[in-house]
Amino acid sequence: MSLQTASKVWKGSTTSNALGMFGTGFLVLGILGMAVSFASDVKHFWHAYLVMFMFLLSLGLGALFYLALEYLVGAYWSVPIRRVTEGVAGLLIPVAFLSIPIFMGGMDHLYSHWIPHHAHHAEGHAHHGEEHDKHKAKVDKYQKSDSNTYSDKAKDHKHKSSDAYGGHHEPDPIVEGKRPFLSKPWFYVLNIGCFLIWIAFFYWFRNNSREQDKDGSQKYTQRNVIMSAPFMLVFAATLTIAAIYYMMSLEPHWFSTMFGIYYFAGTLVSAASILTILVITLHQNGFLHSQMKKDTYYSLGLMMFAFNVFWAYISFSQFMLIWYANLYEETMWFIYRYEGGWATVSWFLILFHFVIPFFALLSRDQKTNPSRLIFMAYWLLAAHILDLYWIIVPTYAETSFQLSDLGFLIFAAGFVMFFFNSGVKGANLVPIKDPKLEHGLEFKIH
């Protein structure tokens, strides 16, 4: 069978049309659910929106990293599934538009603790006083339980980070020290710049890949290889900037030099998981090359396993370093996540995100069983969402989930279905004239 005729055409297929329709339906249902959330609790709405935004961003960034990594290391096994990776990386374009609501309306609710007083909405002042009282109670509790550790530091940090610009308090010196970085203009410029860089690299990699379908020239591969190395350096910087601005700045008193790589580890897990779901589903329905072996499934399962272990390693390392240093500014971040219902979530996250997936993906048989791989891929996507929820929501709430949060999950599912389908319509789902395709199809695990 010819390498160029061994898969179905995606564009115009029944599956493509169905995916587009389901995606549209899920988007509509998700918007309705999000509207209910906005009407019931504006503050919670914006924090749940940020969770959804960072989740969708992680899918696109992780796929873009895998795309560049393939060229950088000269991988063969991933060539037959490259168009799927390109389709997921293409989510970065519509995700960029999801940042606009945060810029226009969400910042005053999410980052009011470092936005100057004149930029606040009126209702923010009452919230600051409430946050101050909650934080003071926590400080008093931990001062009493470990006065030698916290008493001196607590005197200098009487207010929670979100009280930095409260209506009745002086500007916070810690926030003021970070003022050149924590400002709306820099937030806009740096984050818009990050998206422009990511999208520019994405178009470079994808366009060269698609141009190769016309004449099979090796020059297109070489162009991407040359660009992949500098991309890695730029990617590390821009991803860290995004993680700091969107999530770490929710609590500007807290800082961690490992936070960027912590989010990066999550993007690798989530992107590997969504790629596993899409690749297996498309292959089983005849849209990827028929000669592709289950060894490709094994590689995807290995990526999920390895990068999830990497996530656990980074998570534990960050916790251990903060626990060992025992600095008030750092430890309070974990204390907030061990208060109220968040203590249960914290322990559950360890089990749900690491322990169970570790044993479920440990054996070779598990990594070559399509149905089990898809199940674990969905599991890890849910674990990544929980991780983001655990990072973001405790910054303002002592309780966790709300029923209206389902609207954000439905919207995210529809978003992926609709825009992935739209993004891969313009080309073959297999890079039919890539010189490495045949080697990729012959790939076997030894």
Language-model features: locations:
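Hydrophobic core of alpha-helical transmembrane segments in multi-pass integral membrane proteins
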Residues: 20-39, 99, 236-239, 354-358, ...
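Aromatic-anchored segments of alpha-helical transmembrane domains
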Residues: 237-241, 378-389
